[in-house]
Amino acid sequence: MLYYSGPVARLVDEFAKLPGIGPKTAQRLAFHVLNSPPELAQGLAKALVEVRQSIKRCSLCCNLTDEDPCSICQDTTRNSNLLCVVEEPRDVIAMEKARGYRGYYHVLHGAISPMEGIRPEDLTIKELLHRLQNGDIQEVILAANSDVEGETTALYLARLLKPLGVKVTRIAHGIPVGSDLEYADAMTLNKALEGRGEFG
């Protein structure tokens, strides 16, 4: 039974579609928007539309950006021999905040997960292989999460990349098993990078 009008119910439903937002939090957010000055709702709506219109994938690393190539790919002070492969754009943010890595990135936009119907061809693996063709990259660091999907993805990539003659390493497991990179602190991330080893 609905206790509020159609537009409010729709707003609650839309908030509830976001990850980590349950029905009660969605309701709380909706009523916060309703009880705030109109500028809050207008600013939120404008930001949502703007981000959907202006953000795209970098043609080199597949990270989300408003310019192509992205600022990281344009940075010539980075080590062009290193490529760190991560699952999501938020993992790039975590790595950059840790300030321990100065190579380039490749964002897969997910991990292989048969249970969720995510196959290798659903990820940006084709773009990764294309990137490795120029021969500049000497080491690929697999920084997929240390959960089942991340390990599956890392093993798949290691088997795919080994024949290309590139060194394939996996970040060390200072990252707790089953956790996501974005939640790791800077020191843990840096130690995991330093302790990486050959993989596959």
Swiss-Prot record:
SMART domains: HhH1, TOPRIM. Keywords: DNA damage, DNA recombination, DNA repair, Metal-binding, Zinc, Zinc-finger. The lineage of its organism: Bacteria, Bacillati, Bacillota, Clostridia, Eubacteriales. A zinc finger (C4-type) spans 58-73. GO terms for molecular function: DNA binding; zinc ion binding. This is Recombination protein RecR. May play a role in DNA repair. It seems to be involved in an RecBC-independent recombinational process of DNA repair. It may act with RecF and RecO. Belongs to the RecR family.
